[in-house]
Each structure stands twice: as structure tokens, then as C-alpha cells.
């Protein structure tokens, strides 16, 4: 009986720990089966209220929404007139898998526990096709969002839903266009991606009462099968009951439909379309296998209910994963869109105006009627103002947009007239004094420079007698909703306002929306029922800006070369070909299909092959095998000559002049015979049809010769100056352009003395990064020129060209400098392999200015070389010095240092600095964290109390061959089971304390040799364990026998709080022939209720014990411990602490 109680208590503890580790406890994670009879709820006749409205599709339009605000559920038995588009009724789950991808991960709900798990579409399709009698559990998919997949084109929502959905009409549309990720990963989401869902349920699935996230409304089409709904209206009393029901945690015991006064059960059949308004509480049952398409949407005609549902989600702590994304950001954009569409004033940033509204004032150089600076005035004077300076381009554009402008002007005049009538009627009835109405209108009038452009003379100005057009009046639902929305956003604390990036000035936006609500507080309802939505995006074709210069993008393998008449102008003789822009992009070459690499098969082992789908990979790299990379790729057949426009007319055995050749410098492809110039080219052996054309080759030769002459002249001048002044300093030569080597080695100029030392060869000179030395040379040259020309006299043209041109002065030798051996900070001097010796004695007379310049230059070079690691000859020693410094930093400080530069980042990832990595108690291990662990190759890895999965752990251990110590305390067996594979490294420490779900069977799987690969090592992967921690596990003597057999080197064993262990367990560990008898040095038996004084008699056999932990063992007395110490005092001295901790002294 006591053993059964222990097992029951352990089971409770496991359940509590699993719920504690989950990220929040929601209504989707409540464990335990329901206690009410669902079959009785399906047969009961008390759910007979009547809330449903049956309609035809043609009646569900914008005018219907404006009249009723979409408050009641609607059923359409036929889809005609709705504007929806659906696949054929025989569309199956396998078809869904084909369109969204078999690897797509979907959230699956366990109907029995109402807890969510994850499956791939391939796994779900296999489960769905399994016969009903073979299904062990009931699973339900209710959240497969398939926008931006191939399935998206097969499903179209009702037309009216498209007209009122905030995502389509409110959210900046350029953000939606940027969405590329098909899944609902919040990090990659550019807009609220909740518009199209696929729901797949098997017979018997049940989803408990809930309200759709964020108070969204739902459209729902039954493609196959059927559904049963229980509907509860969103009254104040019902919503309060629903909130208390969620917080009670008794969803499995209470059927919410029995607690409310009114509830309706309705059955939906195949082909039905169902619309659930905002806030309606509903439960769903699936009487047969069903495939449903639907979606969620927010709209402007029930904003108060949407806000209330979102507040309920706040109070019930619904996890972010199950909530409407970007909710408050969407609310801000709602206010902005209403202000823009009603007042023609935009509060978006310039970028958002350009991308979503197609407004680009900076490029056009003029105002557009729909820009933020357009007037929102409704007075007729604002319409009659015009500018006399409108050019012809403005009039052309206005003629193009005349119809739309005329309609907008008529709406403005009609609205003004209606407001005047309202004011007169209200004054006559003496209900309210509207004297301030005119003042508000005057406030809205903008300066003449910001008013709309006057229509062209061909378009008459709107008059009061003009026929009425679509009225921009607001319905009562919109006015009340916007007022609630403003109050909600103003009441939010600053950190929860969630102001989006596209809003420029939120205070001005709030001010304008309040004025808008004041102006439209008494709009006549009959004029607001127009059947036309107020919030609409302007058509991009009408507002497309053509003034930005177009940039031509060309693909190298598809680009046709320019014709002969459109070739680039010839280069000047003074400009080398290597410094000019290439005449065209280099063409992408194709396989020759003749070499050995092209004809052989894939190896199947390289990283490219492993990525291929035919070898089981994801197919993302889209690269060919490493062994199949062509050795001589040829030009594609589509390439033509840039001069004559003809293709290659020859093969390898015919005339060379008709063979297409590609230049390695300018990338131009021509026939050699088409070049009308005399000269010689340079053939290349690297690729077929590859050469250096005569234009580039001849130009390069002339450039080299010119450079050579200039260097000689410059050297002669320097030598003459040296001889006259008897000064000794290194010569400065002009560096040729990048990619060209100097024609002759640099010479060290010495004064004519018979005792002077021979010049040092170039290989002995200290190499300096060219870019940094060029910059310093420029700075010094400019400083000297300022000193030489204090009155601002002009420099010579040659000096200016020398500073700006491609030829820059570079010092090839530096004077020696004493090294400091006591420097602590690692600098260049400390890491140079051999100290630099002076080439010759120092000169007797040296210019002081030159000495200061060289010292400053040397210090700058040393600092740059040390920080950026630019000295190749001392890189390894430099790294070792910095690593010795990095060893004193914590991991947090080291991560900060890694942001300094690329060299520090590379050195900071050295595995010697990361031998121990501790990520314990991290809420989530993202892929970037796992990649960082792999990059650092730790020896000790602590993953305790994390939610690491089996897949993640397998990925880690496969890439950490040097891992020795692994800490998995507090994890689950599903993750720890990854160690049972043959790829597990040879660990020396394994910590499995308080791991959920581990018993004797699981320990056997870990310790026995892996059998997942045939012919593998028959020994256990944990045979080198020296430290094993099994505290808090339900293990017995079976586990101890496995440890004795498979862990011969075990020295530390932690068996604390294992309730099934007894004195016989200790006897096994110290029995004759047991490997642990001679290897154990530390044994922990704290909290083991079955251990008594008899265990100490068995522990005397272990000759190497240094620590015995018995605290919490109630059946072990202190007297027995003292007796144990006294009996062993002859050979070994022990001491006893107050907590029954026996430690070895000598």
C-alpha cells in the first residue's frame, strides 16, 4: 500500500513539473479528460435558441454591413453571389500537403487533453488517412494559415470580407507585399497573417467554448464533411461567465452552454458558408472527417466588442502565440486611414507614403491631390483657389485624373451642403447651438499653397446643382468604434502603446481624429448607407510615379549584349583599361559535358549532396556536387558577339577569328576577326574561349611603360636632393594601380659614400597595408602644403593630380625603433618573431620633422596591425597574446569584445575560451544559440532545466565530438533519449537529476550499446563515465546492475532521493566482483528512505571512498556513522558532520 502511495505521489509531481516548465498555462494546455457527456449535449433539445440569420450571397454586401454592423451569425446554404472560390469537393488532405509542403509544421490539438503538439504535414496526412478504428488518439488541426503558399490561389474569401478587412484596407500594403515566409513565425511576419486558414478534423473531434482571438470575426466554408456549433451571444453577463469559466480551470468539468440562459446548437453541412461575428462564444464538434477553409478578420463596425475581447485575453493571460499579431499597431493605422480618407491628411512617414500611397513629392517636385499636404477643407473657396504657375505636366496629369478629382470634389460640396442643412434644422428645433460649426470649418481650411490643385479648364467646377455622388458620411457603428479606439489608445501606458514605425506624429493624429469625430457626430444615417466602403487604397496604376530613373537589371546568363552601334565610346589613351568600368557583366558559363567531372555521378557524401532532396536533404542550397564542378566551363550557346551580333560559328578545329572570345578584363565577348584594330592579345589557359583582348592588353603595356618612366624621373629628383642636402631617408616611389606589380624593385637612395652599406632587398622591407599608408601619406602631404603655402597660394596641377589620382606615394622602409619588453598591453612589438635590426647605422644628421612623421606613422601602423590583425607574419602569435588576455574575461564581457572587429570576433570564438558553456534555465533555445554552441565546441555543456528537444540535442551531440560533461537535470526523457544513438560522444560526466520520465527501462536504453547502425561498436557509449547523477529518479536495483556492467570507470555516483533503493542496492555496488567496489570515491544516498544502518556495513568494502552523503536518511543513526568511522580509523581517517556527511581526511 505504501508503494502505491509513493507511485501516486510521484505521478502528481511529474504532472506539476511538466506544467511548470511550459511557457504559461493556458486553456489549450489543461490536462485531464472532460467529465461531461458530449453525446448528451448533442442530443439535448434545450439548446434551441434562434440567433442564426439565413441569407443568400447576393444580399451579403457592403450596405448590409453598414445597416446592421455584422452583429448576428449568418449561414449561406449556397455560395452563389458571395464571390468565394474553393477547390473541388474531392480536394483531400493529401492535396493540402502537396500545396503547402510536406515539411510544413502544423499545430495539432489533442482532443482528449486540449493540449497542443506539433506535426509535419506528412505526419498529419498519414494520421488523417489512417482508418478510424486504428487511431489511438483524436487530433485536430485548426490553425494552418496557408497565405503565401500555392494553396492561396485556390481559395478566395467572400467579396464583402475583402472590402471590410483591416488587413487589406488598413495595414500598409507595401508591408504585406514584403511578406515571403509562408509560416506564422512572428519574427518573419510583416502583417497580421490570419486571413486564410485550413481546418482538418477527424470524426469525434471537439473544441471547447472559445472566442476567436482579438475579437475577430470568422468566415467558415465547409468543403467536405460537416460541423456542429454551440453558439452563445456576447452579452455582458455571458462574457463575464466566460471569463470566470476560463480562470476557474474547470473547463473539462463544466459545459459552458449549461451555465448561460440562451444557447443555440446548429449543424453545418457540406457546402455551407458560415460567418461568426465578433465576440460570439462557440464550441465545435466534428461528426465526420471534415475539411474546412476559413479566416479571421477585424472590421470597423464592431470595434468596441473587439477591444473588449482583447482585454479579456489580457486578463486571462492568453499566450502571445494564440493572439492577434500587431493588434495595437493595427489600431493606430485605423485612425490614420480614416483621417486620410476623410480629411486628405496623411500621418504616415515619407517612406510609407511613397510605398503604400504611391506619393513621392520629392521626386515629382509638386503637390498631388492625395498627398498629406492636400487640403481637407470642405468650403467652396478652397476649391476655387488655383495656381497660375501650373505647368503643362501638371495639367496633363490632372486631365488623366479628372474623373476621380471631379467625384471627390462633388463629395466635398455635397457634404458641406448637408452639414449646412443639419445646422439649420438643429437651430430651428433648438436642440443644440451649432454656432461653433463655422469656426471648425475655418480651422480645417489650409493655406493656399497647400490646397488641392484646381481642375483644368476642360473640367467644370462642382456646383450645388451637380448630381450627388458617393457620400463620405460615417455610420453610427464607425463613429462609436473610433471613439472607443481613441480612448483605448490614450489610456495605454507609454510602453504598451505599440506605436508602429509608419506613424509620424501620434499626437497630431489623435488631434485630427477627434476633430473628425466631432464633425461627423451627427451625420445622417440614411446618407451613410451608400454600399461603398470609405476606406480604400488608391489604385497603383493611376498614381504610379515615372519620374524616378529606371535601373536596368540584367542576368549574366540571359543578357543579350548591346548591338554594334550602342557600344561604349573608346577609352582615352591616358586612362588604363584596368581602372575603367567594365563594358558588361561577366557571362555565366555552362558545363562542357566532356570533362571527367561532368560525366561522373554525385558522390552522395559532400555537404551539397546531403542537401539534395534525392539524398534526403531539404534542397535549399541548389548546388551541384563538389566532384561534379566542371573543369572547363564554356560560354552558353545564346551568347552573341558584341560587334556583329552573331553566335559562335566554329568549333575547336576551325578558324580562330570566328571563335567567340571573352576578355578577362572588360568581360566583352567578340569574334577576334571583328576587332578593327592592330595589336596583340593574350590567351589564357584557365578557361576555354578566354583571353585578354588587344584593347586591354595594349593599354596595360602603355600604362606600365608610363609608370616606369615616371618612377625613374621621381627617383632621380630624390637622389639629387639627397646628394645636395646630405640627408639620409628612404625613397618614395609612386605605387602603380591595384592589380599591377611595379616594373622594377624599389631602390634605397644613399648619399655617395664609399662606406655606405648595400641596399636592402625588397623582401626584407616591412610590408604595410596600402590603404592605411595611402591615407596617412595624403594627410601628411596636405599638412606640408598648408605649411609651405600659408598665404593660400595655388598648388601646382601636378601635385593635385598626384594626390587625387591612382598613383599614391608609399614608404617602403621605416627607421628602427626601440622595443619595450615591459609593455603589458599586447602590441606589435610583443608579437614580432624577430626584433628588427637596423639595416645600417643611424645618420649623423636627420631632419627632425621627418623623424616625427616616421614615428607617428609607425605608431599608427602598429595600432592598426594589432587591432585588425593585418600582419600575416605575426597573426598566430598575435592571436595567442590576445587569447591570454581574453582568458581573464567573463563570457558576458567576451561577447562585448567580440563586437569590436572581425579579428576579435574570430578569436573570441576560440574553443579554449568556451570550454564551459552554461545555458541552464533558458526559456527557449533558438537555432542561433545552438549554432553558437557548435561554433565554440565546449567540453562542459549545461542544459539543465531547459526545454531542449530531442531533435536539438541530437543536432548538438552529432557536432560536439569533444564534449565530456553534459548536464541535463530537469529535462524530459523525450530529449534525453537522444543519447541512446551511436553518435553520442564519450562522456565522462552525465547529470540526469530530476529528469521526467526516466525509469529502469530508459536507463537500459542509455547504457546498452546503440543498435541504430549495423556493424557499429558493440560497447556502450557511456563506458567512460566517471560521474553519474541520478538523483530523484524512480530507479531500482536493475539500474545499478546496468551501471556495474557498462560503467567500469565510475567514481562518483549520486542516488539521492531515489525512493526504490534499499540496503540491498548498496550491497550490489560493493559486492565481490563489482567494478564500482574499487572505483567509487563519492556516493550520495541522501533522502533514500530504504537505506538503514546496514548499508554502512556494506560500504566498508569500498576501499577508495572519500565522501558518503547520508543526510535525510531517517533510518541511518548517528551512532552507526561514528562506529563506521572508528572501525576504519586504523587505515583511513574520516570525519562526521551534523548532517550525516562522512568525509575522508587522509
Curated annotation (Swiss-Prot):
Keyword Zinc (UniProt): yes
User: Which co-factors does it depend on?
Assistant: Fe(2+)
List the residue ranges of the region (Disordered). Answer: 363-467, 554-585, 733-800, 832-867
> Compositional bias of type Basic and acidic residues: which residue ranges?
402-442, 772-789
Q: Residues in domain JmjC?
A: 146-314
Subcellular location, principal: nucleus
Q: What is this protein called?
A: Lysine-specific demethylase 2A
Originating species = Xenopus tropicalis
